[in-house]
């Protein structure tokens, strides 16, 4: 990975607000289990620690998907892929706001979009994979994007599955609705991406 490739990717992230030199100040512990202060659940709360962790980590997960979607604007000319990438961009940013609002409502730490760079959740791409995607153009980019985003979406679905397996989690009304919406939307998009991938020229 060259310095030029790294700098161009960082420039994109800073320009779109998905990287910040002060992101480390938010108390990220670089684990898959917690970001920010220790989670304290009030007695009698309708939500669980797993609900809070799910919302916090899904913010980071969504934020990386948006970074990937924005790369398509400059790196792809595939009309169907661009339509999908714009849908991902336009739908997941409002969902991040929903999750942040949910966390603030319950006085829990709400990470910003730069948090994706500090954690690695199910299906998230590595810095190397993002750098390769940033470098690629045309069909090469399309294939990397589709394979990467299918993996990314599958990771989000696994996160929801893990949420509902946690005792008492996913029962708070807004959490339940949101989590099920994530599964429905991303399952449908995986189907679209698999079809697009099958239509690409053979290597």
Predicted region positions:
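All-alpha RGS (Regulator of G-protein Signaling) helical domain and cognate RGS-like helical scaffolds
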Residues: 25-203
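N-terminal signal peptide c-region/cleavage motif recognized by signal peptidases
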Residues: 19-21
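Bacterial N-terminal signal peptides that target proteins for export
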Residues: 1-10
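Bacterial N-terminal signal peptides
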Residues: 9-17
């Amino acid at each position: 990975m060259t310095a030029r490739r790294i700098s161009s990717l960082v420039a994109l992230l800073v320009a779109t607000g998905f990287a910040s030199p002060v992101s480390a100040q938010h108390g990220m512990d670089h684990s898959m289990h917690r970001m920010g202060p220790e989670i304290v659940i009030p007695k009698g709360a309708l939500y669980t620690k797993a609900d809070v962790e799910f919302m916090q980590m899904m913010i980071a997960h969504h934020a990386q998907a948006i970074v990937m979607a924005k790369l398509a604007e400059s790196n792809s000319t595939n009309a169907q892929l661009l339509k999908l990438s714009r849908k991902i961009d336009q739908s997941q940013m409002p969902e991040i706001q929903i999750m942040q609002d949910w966390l603030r409502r319950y006085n829990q730490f709400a990470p910003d979009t730069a948090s994706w760079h500090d954690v690695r959740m199910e299906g998230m791409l590595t810095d190397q994979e993002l750098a390769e995607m940033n470098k690629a153009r045309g069909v090469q980019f399309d294939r990397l994007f589709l394979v990467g985003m299918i993996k990314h979406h599958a990771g989000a679905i696994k996160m929801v599955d893990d949420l509902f397996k946690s005792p008492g989690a996913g029962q708070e009304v807004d959490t339940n609705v949101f989590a099920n919406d994530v599964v429905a939307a991303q399952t449908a998009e995986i189907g679209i991406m698999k079809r697009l991938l099958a239509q690409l020229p053979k290597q």
